[in-house]
Swiss-Prot record:
Major localisation: membrane
This protein's name: NADH-quinone oxidoreductase subunit B/C/D
Domain of life, per lineage: Bacteria
UniProt similarity note: In the N-terminal section; belongs to the complex I 20 kDa subunit family.
Native organism taxonomy: Bacteria, Pseudomonadati, Thermodesulfobacteriota, Syntrophobacteria, Syntrophobacterales
Cystine pairings recorded for this chain: none
Span list, region Disordered: 154-205
Enzyme Commission identifier(s): 7.1.1.-
Length: 787
């Protein structure tokens, strides 16, 4: 056969293939949001030769690996790739997929090219939608210039098609060091146990102010008195705290005290807000602490109040009683502590790993466990083939029964991220449901123990990559609470403005995807228009889109730019009419109502008991919003209503979120109209990054800038917990400081962890078709659940 004919055939085949690429519907993390945005009207990826995302790997020939590659999900990624038909191509999208990015941590593969061949790399964190389009055109050029498919198609020797590049080996055929080539001989400064070393540093000799101290209210004093009378020396009140009443409890009386606080105390602390542990083995004042500290945060609704309980444990394999019989929500929290710390809970109904793979060795949040992936053996293609997810049968409570067991996920169009549902079916009816999470676990709490207080801010927005700057607020407020940093009024209102813009953005994405979940595709093509308008405002103000990383300790990174108010006013003018138009598409639609009304019900009492928060809680009839109950950042100065519904079903959750958008717009309008004058960051530069103009005027500001940027500010020794009302619910940060430039313990309480744990309660007795409607109505996001 002549070369001329083969060359012509190569041209025709390459032209056909490069302009008819079929990407797989597959996403790992933040980058997938921008990948999906590339298919919306502003960008319209179809113009560039890539059509609708395909739900099955057997229908796709392009795998865009968008986001962080986790060791737990890596075998699934490999399986999806191997199920794709030849020829097939791979685009690695974003810094995390390319090389691990900012997640050099125990749970993350340092690049997808360690298990798959990669044709095109798209840099960025995350790349913009325009970068996705450029990556696609680069792949098309590669297909046209490098591939000779005719011989393969005609079963002749020679030729090439699809991905042909080799899989790389970390440390052998690619750089092992996360800082890039040429850095292998330079030791990384600092670990979770050892702070960064600066030769000749006298920082330990420097005086720093003590942590903030609060006065107990009369109600809190009464609670302390009652606990002392009831439990005697088994309960000891901590004399000084920065945020809430704190009590140390003897382990053998812990369960009694917790039960009393929930069922008999006045007020009753009905919700277990969080449960976590602290490994005390690396404390500088080691003799003052036990080996471990268990920490319980409780919440009362009437009146609004919080309390913290702590108990000390000793030994390498400590144990204490489970409290799952007091709060069912403790189930996952205790499993997480067992998984990451190795602390056992006696009487727990199912104490097994929850975040890490089932065959993982060790407990990552122990201080002696390596924090960086580059401190561990390189992850290889062989590892991905060996460490497979467990069979769905092990999750069922009746493995020998006659129920049909159905796996949904961990990669599925309707799971809204990397989450695995194991469904037991009696015909079409769901008889039981188990979830396997942890596929998106990227060790952010461990990272918080090595990054300085300022360096950790970029990680916050990535905990919920659709809530943007709203994620930063509970973190910076927790540190500000501990260090008693006063935030200027202008900075507080700017924070509110950005947080509410991201609430609108989040709910617009939810509106579109939820409508799609139940069969209405049209909203997808409309709501992203206003979302892009909101992100344009965010970009105008902060310079970023999804992850501005713009909040700072003591304020925000910069003052508002020229033109910000005009852009916000334009949004305020057009948004109400657009929202009415979108709502008219589905609110009274008989199909939508049939799919959502009476489906996925949960009572108010169950929602409280399981720790549900945000719109999902308010849809059960409880008017609970932290912006009202624990006002922060000046929210007490804004007029807005707290939307509620009483049915507790999918339709009620829809109604609450739609009305929340209207209320957020009211707050945005007030913030823009009444923006106070003044500073955008505090002038107390002991802990914050000084304004550049001040560093040019006086040496004191310049010194603070140098110290706080290099080794980080020395935040006082102590602890603080702050929770904020982000779009999906209550997100809290519990920061523990040991007087150094970074956190000793960084704990994140994500709303999705509790909201998703209740999923079996919502789904039992419903049909399998209704499960998709229930999943979408809860509005969770995986990095918030898995952290």
């Amino acid at each position: 056969m002549s070369d001329r004919f083969l060359s012509a055939a190569d041209f025709v085949l390459n032209w056909s293939r490069k302009y008819s690429l079929w990407p797989l519907f597959f996403g790992l993390s933040c980058c997938f949001v921008e990948e999906a945005t590339a298919f919306t009207p502003r960008y319209d990826m179809a113009r560039f030769g890539a059509e609708v995302l395909r739900p099955s790997p057997r229908q796709a020939d392009l795998l865009i690996v968008s986001g962080t590659v986790f060791k737990k999900i890596a075998p699934v990624v490999l399986r999806l790739y191997e199920q794709m038909a030849e020829p097939k191509w791979v685009i690695s999208m974003g810094s995390c997929s390319n090389c691990g990015g900012m997640y050099d941590v125990y749970s993350v593969v340092q690049g997808i090219d360690q298990i798959l061949p990669v044709d095109v790399y798209i840099p960025g964190c995350p790349p913009r939608p325009e970068a996705v389009l450029q990556g696609l055109t680069l792949l098309q050029k590669k297909i046209a210039a490098e591939e000779r498919p005719a011989r393969s198609v005609l079963h002749l020797p020679g030729g090439s098609q699809g991905s042909t590049r080799p899989v790389l080996v970390d440390g052998a055929t690619k750089s092992r060091d996360p800082r890039g080539p040429g850095m292998e001989g330079t030791v990384i400064r600092g670990t979770a146990n050892t702070p960064p070393a600066f030769t000749g540093s006298r920082s330990d000799l420097m005086w720093t102010p003590p942590a903030r101290r609060i006065e107990s209210s009369e109600r809190e004093k009464e609670l302390a008195r009652v606990l002392s009378e009831r439990f005697g020396d088994a309960v000891r009140e901590e004399p000084f705290t920065s945020d809430m009443p704190t009590f140390h409890v003897e382990t053998n009386r812990l369960k009694d005290v917790l039960g009393f606080l929930k069922k008999e105390a006045s007020p009753r602390f009905l919700r277990l807000d969080d449960l976590t542990a602290v490994d005390e083995s690396a404390r500088r004042d080691r003799s003052a602490y036990p080996d471990w500290t268990m920490v319980y945060h409780l919440l009362s609704f009437e009146p609004a109040g919080r309390v913290r309980l702590k108990t000390g444990l000793h030994g390498r394999q400590p144990a204490l009683p489970s409290i799952t019989d007091i709060w069912p929500s403790a189930n996952w929290y205790e499993r997480e502590v067992y998984d990451l710390f190795g602390i056992r809970f006696e009487g727990h109904p199912n104490l097994r790993r929850i975040m890490m793979p089932h065959d993982w060795e060790g407990h990552p949040l122990r201080k002696d466990y390596p924090g960086r992936a580059t401190q561990m053996a390189p992850y290889t293609l062989g590892d991905a083939r060996v460490h497979q997810p467990p069979d769905g049968g092990i999750f069922t409570k009746d493995p020998g029964g006659d129920r049909l067991v159905l796996n949904i996920g961990p990669s599925h169009v309707s799971t809204h991220g990397l989450l695995r549902y194991v469904v037991s079916l009696d015909g079409e009816e769901i008889s039981d449901l188990e979830l396997e999470i942890g596929y998106h676990h990227r060790g952010v709490e461990k990272i918080g123990e090595r990054q300085t207080w300022h360096q950790f801010i970029p990680y916050c927005a990535r905990v919920d990559y659709l809530a943007g700057a709203a994620n930063d607020l509970p973190y910076v407020m927790a540190v500000e609470t501990l260090a008693d940093i006063k935030v200027p009024e202008r900075a507080q209102v700017i924070r509110v403005l950005l947080s509410e813009l991201f609430r609108l953005s989040n709910h617009l994405v939810w509106f579109a995807t939820y409508a799609h979940d139940v069969g209405a595709m049209t909203p997808n093509f409309y709501t992203f228009t206003e979302r892009e308008m909101i992100l344009d405002i965010v970009e105008l103000i902060t310079g970023g889109r999804l992850h501005p990383s713009w909040f700072r300790l003591g304020g925000v990174a910069a003052d508002l730019p020229e033109g910000w108010k005009e852009a916000v006013d334009a949004l305020v003018r057009i948004f109400p009419g657009r929202l009415r138009e979108y709502e008219s598409l589905i609110r009274k639609n008989p199909i939508f109502k049939a799919r959502t009304q009476g489906v996925g019900r949960i009572s108010r009492e169950d929602a409280v008991d399981w720790g549900v928060s945000g719109p999902n809680l308010r849809a059960c009839g409880l008017e609970w919003d932290l912006r009202r109950k624990f006002p922060y950042s000046g929210y007490e100065n804004f007029e807005f209503e707290v939307p509620t519904a009483v049915e507790g079903d999918c339709y009620a959750r829809y109604l609450v979120r739609v009305e929340e958008m209207r209320q957020s717009l009211r707050i945005i309008e007030q913030a823009a109209a009444n923006m106070p004058s003044g500073r955008h960051v505090t002038d107390d530069y002991r802990y914050v990054i000084p304004d550049r103009r001040d560093t040019l005027k006086n040496i004191e500001s310049l010194i603070h800038h140098f110290v706080n940027v290099t080794r980080g500010p020395r935040i006082p020794k102590g602890e603080a917990y702050v929770s904020c009302e982000i779009p999906r619910g209550e997100q809290g940060y519990y920061v523990v400081g040991d007087g150094l430039g970074y956190a000793y313990r960084m704990r994140i309480r994500g709303p999705g962890f509790a909201n998703v744990q209740v999923m079996p309660l919502l789904a039992r007795g419903e049909s399998i078709a209704d499960l998709i409607a229930i999943i979408g109505s809860v509005d969770y996001i995986l990095p918030d659940i898995d952290r």
